[in-house]
Amino acid sequence: MDPERAGPDTSSEPLPGAGSAAPSSYVGEDRAAGRYAVARRHRWLLGPAVLLLAVVVLRAFFVTPFGIPSESMQETLLVGDRLLVSRTTPPDQVQRGDIVVFDASEAFNLDVPQRGVLQRLVEAVESLAGKGQPTDYVKRVIGLPGDHVRCCAVDGRLEINGVAVTEPYLAAGARPSSTPFDVIVPPDRFWMMGDNRGASADSRAHLGEPGGGMVPGSDIIGKVWVRYWPLDRLGSVDQGQIASVPRNGE
């Protein structure tokens, strides 16, 4: 028999396992490594997401930052001061003399321009850093619902429900108001004034308009709680409570 034809030629056949897929243990390790990498990326994303959510919740329900943009509350609050405003004080617990931040768009009949989605998003991000909306004002509560407030009494002081009151937060020698007024605050409304009476566009500036410059309780964002900037003025803000006066008509 021809030795060259004795059997099939196997010299070109691959060895067992040659060219086959990698062992299953290697595949499992690769998959595990991939899952670990994905989980790690998710953790990196989850942390900032949770932090952002916490900030949003705190700002919406507890405290919100606010920067002082004007001189209307000098000398109590200066331009550039940064505050934390407590949102936990309901309107019926607001007292005379409290410093509050409120949305003045309704009370002061402000023209609010239409804003697109992108602009609203930018404003939302800026608000987290303490930049308020153009319609957010900070003033001192002078008249509560039902109060009779007028300026000025015979001795030149502000008068609430027939009682001339001392305002320790005004600068020395400052007049309570160069604009005379005599108002009765409606239910669920507040009469607001800035401490820098000569440079404050407050309730007095809107006497002849619909609503008479009275701020609805529902528009009060919160009560000023603490100043966190600048550091040399860090601390609580003196609310300068007005002395107790009787209710109107008592």
Question: How should each PLM-predicted stretch be described?
Answer:
Residues R43-F61:
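Hydrophobic membrane-insertion alpha-helices, especially the h-region
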Residues D2-H42, F61-G67, E75, V79-E250:
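Soluble "head" domains of membrane/secretory-pathway proteins
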